[in-house]
Amino acid sequence: MQRHMLKSKIHRAAVTHCELHYEGSCAIDEDLLEAANIVENERIDIWNINNGERFSTYAIKGERGSGMISLNGSAARRAQLGDLVIIAAFAMIDEEELKAGWKPDLVFVDEGNKIKGSRDHVPTQNWT
């Protein structure tokens, strides 16, 4: 059996560009793509923390070290500059990979979209 699992996540990145008339996609700083194990043309889901929008597109390379998160084409209508988004990619993982200890790549960024940390699990949510 295969399970559809979270593979990659860039958490709370700020939208830096909205390019309505650019060919559709999301340009992501190449440093972030590599850290999150997302490749060019891979399908990604984007969840806008500010307005609740959730949509899918594909990743393209943004300038390395720029902090770029550019929503292009129709995706540009789903956010405003400065909105915080979660960018996620999923993969089909078989039971053997899961038993062998497969983990996702989770990347956390600062207010300039520079990497401030990473981990391979989502912590248990507790009541506080």
Swiss-Prot record:
In the UniProt record, does the keyword Transcription occur? no
Q: How is it modified after translation?
A: Is synthesized initially as an inactive proenzyme, which is activated by self-cleavage at a specific serine bond to produce a beta-subunit with a hydroxyl group at its C-terminus and an alpha-subunit with a pyruvoyl group at its N-terminus.
Record keywords, A-Z: Autocatalytic cleavage, Cytoplasm, Decarboxylase, Lyase, Pantothenate biosynthesis, Pyruvate, Schiff base, Zymogen
Return the cofactor note field: Binds 1 pyruvoyl group covalently per subunit.
- Needed co-factor(s): pyruvate
- On the tree of life, the source organism's domain of life is Bacteria
**Reaction it catalyzes:** L-aspartate + H(+) = beta-alanine + CO2
What's one GO-annotated cellular component?
cytosol
Subcellular locations according to the entry = Cytoplasm
Q: What is its EC number?
A: 4.1.1.11
CDD domains given in the database record: Asp_decarbox
GO BP terms: alanine biosynthetic process; pantothenate biosynthetic process
Q: In which pathway does it act?
A: Cofactor biosynthesis; (R)-pantothenate biosynthesis; beta-alanine from L-aspartate: step 1/1
Q: Where substrate is bound, by residue?
A: T57, G73, S74, A75
Cite the active-site annotation. S25 (schiff-base intermediate with substrate), Y58 (proton donor)
Extract the GO molecular function terms from the UniProt entry.
aspartate 1-decarboxylase activity
Q: Which positions does the record annotate as the modified residue Pyruvic acid (Ser)?
A: S25
Keyword Cytoplasm applies:
yes
Q: Name one Pfam family in it.
A: Asp_decarbox
Self-association or partners: how does it assemble?
Heterooctamer of four alpha and four beta subunits.
What is the similarity comment for this entry?
Belongs to the PanD family.
- Spell out the PANTHER family in the cross-references: ASPARTATE 1-DECARBOXYLASE
Instruction: Outline what the protein does.
Output: Catalyzes the pyruvoyl-dependent decarboxylation of aspartate to produce beta-alanine.
Q: What is this protein called?
A: Aspartate 1-decarboxylase
Q: Which organism is it from?
A: Burkholderia thailandensis (strain ATCC 700388 / DSM 13276 / CCUG 48851 / CIP 106301 / E264)
